[in-house]
């Protein structure tokens, strides 16, 4: 039916589209048209037509009802309902909406596919998509506001609120009101993790005119009625800007970053994208996101603020630690250095990761693994779920034994968290015995971790300011390809990044930093991992049988694995998927501990799979895990050559006792030190591995031998040396000094060129030995 003159007088022509098979929306989504491939020729051809938006090929188009009924008078709509019926009219409108949605979806898919191809072309030619995004955003902003003119704002707010001033007052209050999770979630179901007394003080000290009032209070309603006639939108926006940029808020943020926050309970998937951390125009410190956890996971905790802004102020830190560790503040409640804030200004969006069931989350994302052990157990769980021997907590008999017991416990934390006893000075006399310290084992870790996070946040903030990266740019966390090569200060910026890596990557950033620095970010292909797991037409090879034999004995002292842990099925799927991805290599012993080590950090097994793929194919030298293990065997000869040059005393002692260093170091290299050293040092080694490359393996081996020089020279038999160097997990290395020595001491001796030269000679000698 063609519309009458009265009905069609307001009919608006829309953009043309391809003919799409019609279907009734009322019958369900199964009748929706399938996606079609749209080409630029189709768009150009359709643009020449003057037909309405949805053109039908069949005779039904003659009886279609126009889709612009919202513009016709009420009388015309009533006549249409009387003539065609409400059901038919509604069905026709629903069909129009469905066809419009289908066309827009196809168009969006078409241009997204083109954009993906262009990005891949840029990467293949060595160009950075970040710079392209930056220039495009600048051009779009310039074309959107010609001649540097900003959009005009109506002087009369009633034009926006429909002549209803009371609505404008509420809109103005909503604009200024800071976002709190309690707006959407009931307070009884959530316990805030961060508590900021300084924030409450700063907000209360501000003038009442600068802060939004409670909409439910009587004073708010009265003041809204009085001010409604004189409110201006421009003044309200300026007021909001001045409030967010005020000195009180700046002081609040400085206090927030000076106080040490507990990162142990944070979900890394919520805080892993630091590009969403933004600051106000007048505040240079990074913003901090408040995270809320379930009330059933942990009761409300007592909080204290420990200042770490100035590293030289050890006096305040000692006194704060004494207060933290005193029995008077225990009260049988878990203690945390974090602070809680029930309300804080909105600081921008936060990237949400995949929803991982709690039972399959790794220990680094959970804080309740400690419930698996009794309080009287002789073992404790570290941050990553490994069982460790509990320091002696027998009651000392004399003051000398008390001090010795305190030093023993602090030595335990020094080896695990990188803090030294000298830092506390004479404050050892004010601390309690080791059981209390063990109950507060997160304190020392939180202090160093919060300092690292602050330094990394500042680095990210400056990096994004340099390249003008916005929330819409999907270039990952670092944009690693442009850190050291772009700009006049690129080299300096790269050295700054490497210094941060040497000091340790914070746990909340570690997952994404590893993905980008290792190259796994670029290897990711949606659906490929599921495709590998779904292959059923292949005959199970010997690799799968070997995987089933090895996974049950992988990381036996970790609660996440240990033969029957929740990580075992995930590890098996990762190893089987890689054996199908690279059948030439298949599976080799050493991959199991590397994959398990990655699953301690990555809740998504797909991310862990691509990390394993990148380590084997990008980070380590070629043919490292091939069946003949030629490259990995040659590297042991290279290491022996470096030991002979740099540590001649140790080399002579090993030769005198007939110790074959290859038999010890071969497992170090093949497992990438994942089950050789303490877990916290292994994570730091991976930080350096993805920054410096495989040269890190040789530098770490030389650092181990040099650090244990006295113990090695004290061994009088080869069996003693084999026994000592084969299990270094419980040895007390100092993480910071160990990593810095491995990164800097051997940087001139152990280089890629020297390794390649020695490796080629070693491979030649091994080939000659095989031929003979």
From Swiss-Prot:
SUPFAM superfamilies: Ypt/Rab-GAP domain of gyp1p
Recorded superkingdom: Eukaryota
Residues recorded as bearing Phosphothreonine in the entry: 395
Chain intervals with Polar residues compositional bias: 143-161
Biased composition (Low complexity): 275-291
Molecular functions (GO terms): GTPase activator activity
GO terms classed as biological process: vesicle-mediated transport
Domain Rab-GAP TBC: residue ranges: 504-693
PROSITE patterns xref list: TBC_RABGAP (PS50086)
Keyword presence, Thylakoid: no
Name of the protein in question: TBC domain-containing protein C4G8.04
Source organism of this protein record: Schizosaccharomyces pombe (strain 972 / ATCC 24843)
Phylogenetic lineage: Eukaryota, Fungi, Dikarya, Ascomycota, Taphrinomycotina
């Amino acid at each position: 039916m063609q519309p009458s003159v009265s009905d069609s007088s307001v009919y608006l022509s829309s953009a043309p589209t391809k003919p799409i098979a019609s279907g009734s929306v009322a019958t369900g989504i199964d009748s929706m048209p399938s996606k079609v491939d749209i080409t630029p020729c189709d768009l150009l051809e359709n643009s020449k037509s003057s037909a309405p938006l949805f053109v039908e090929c069949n005779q039904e188009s003659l009886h279609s009802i126009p889709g612009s009924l919202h513009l016709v008078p009420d009388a015309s709509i009533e006549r249409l309902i009387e003539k065609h019926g409400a059901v038919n009219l509604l069905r026709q409108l629903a069909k129009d909406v469905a066809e419009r949605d289908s066309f827009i979806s196809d168009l969006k898919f078409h241009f997204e596919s083109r954009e993906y191809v262009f990005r891949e072309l840029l990467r293949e030619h060595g160009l950075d998509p970040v710079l392209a995004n930056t220039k495009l955003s600048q051009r779009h902003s310039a074309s959107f506001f010609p001649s540097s003119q900003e959009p005009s704002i109506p002087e009369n707010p009633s034009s926006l609120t429909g002549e209803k001033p009371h609505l404008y007052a509420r809109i103005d209050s909503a604009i200024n009101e800071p976002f709190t999770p309690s707006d959407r979630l009931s307070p009884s179901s959530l316990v805030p993790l961060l508590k900021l007394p300084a924030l409450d003080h700063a907000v209360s000290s501000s003038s009442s005119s600068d802060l939004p009032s409670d909409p439910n209070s009587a004073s708010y309603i009265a003041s809204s009625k009085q001010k409604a006639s004189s409110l201006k939108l421009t003044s309200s926006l300026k007021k909001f800007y001045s409030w967010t940029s005020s000195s009180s808020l700046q002081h609040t943020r400085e206090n927030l970053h000076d106080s040490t926050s507990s990162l142990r309970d944070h979900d890394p998937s919520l805080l892993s994208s630091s590009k969403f951390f933004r600051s106000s125009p007048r505040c240079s410190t990074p913003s901090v996101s408040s995270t809320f956890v379930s009330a059933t996971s942990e009761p409300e905790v007592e909080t204290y603020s420990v200042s770490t802004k100035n590293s030289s102020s050890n006096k305040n830190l000692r006194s704060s630690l004494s207060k933290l560790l005193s029995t008077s503040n225990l009260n049988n409640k878990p203690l945390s250095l974090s602070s809680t804030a029930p309300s804080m200004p909105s600081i921008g969006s936060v990237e949400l990761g995949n929803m991982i069931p709690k039972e399959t989350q790794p220990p680094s994302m959970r804080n309740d693994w400690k419930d698996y052990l009794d309080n009287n157990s002789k073992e404790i769980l570290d941050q990553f779920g490994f069982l460790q021997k509990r320091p002696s907590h027998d009651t000392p008999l004399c003051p000398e034994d008390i001090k010795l017991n305190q030093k023993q416990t602090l030595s335990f934390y020094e080896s695990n968290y990188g803090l030294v006893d000298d830092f506390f000075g004479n404050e050892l006399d004010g601390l309690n015995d080791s059981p209390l310290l063990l109950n507060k084992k997160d304190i020392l870790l939180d202090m160093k971790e919060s300092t690292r996070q602050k330094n990394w946040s500042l680095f990210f903030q400056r990096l994004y300011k340099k390249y003008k990266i916005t929330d819409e740019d999907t270039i990952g966390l670092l944009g690693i390809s442009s850190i050291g090569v772009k700009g006049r200060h690129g080299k300096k910026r790269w050295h700054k990044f490497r210094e941060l890596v040497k000091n340790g990557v914070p746990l909340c950033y570690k997952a994404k930093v590893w993905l980008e620095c290792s190259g796994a970010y670029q290897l990711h292909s949606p659906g490929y991992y599921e495709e590998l797991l779904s292959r059923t037409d292949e005959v199970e090879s010997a690799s799968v049988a070997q995987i089933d034999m090895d996974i049950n004995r992988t990381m036996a002292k970790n609660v996440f694995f240990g033969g029957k842990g929740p990580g075992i099925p995930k590890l098996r799927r990762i190893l089987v998927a890689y054996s199908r991805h690279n059948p030439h290599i298949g599976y080799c012993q050493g991959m199991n501990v590397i994959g398990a080590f990655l699953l301690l950090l990555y809740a998504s097994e797909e991310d862990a799979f691509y990390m394993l793929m990148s380590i084997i194919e990008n980070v380590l030298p070629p043919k490292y895990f091939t069946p003949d293990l030629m490259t990995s065997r040659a590297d042991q000869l290279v290491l022996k050559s470096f030991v002979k040059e740099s540590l001649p005393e140790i080399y002579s002692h090993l030769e005198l006792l007939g110790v074959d260093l290859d038999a010890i170091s071969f497992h170090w290299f093949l497992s990438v030190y994942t089950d050789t050293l303490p877990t916290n040092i292994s994570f730091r080694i991976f930080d350096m591995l993805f920054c410096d490359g495989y040269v890190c393996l040789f530098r770490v081996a030389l650092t181990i031998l040099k650090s244990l020089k006295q113990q090695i020279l004290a061994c009088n038999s080869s069996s003693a040396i084999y026994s000592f160097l084969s299990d270094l997990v419980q040895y007390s290395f100092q993480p910071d000094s160990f990593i810095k020595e491995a990164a800097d001491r051997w940087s001139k001796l152990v280089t890629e060129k020297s390794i390649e030269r020695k490796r080629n000679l070693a491979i030649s000698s091994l080939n000659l030995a095989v031929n003979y």
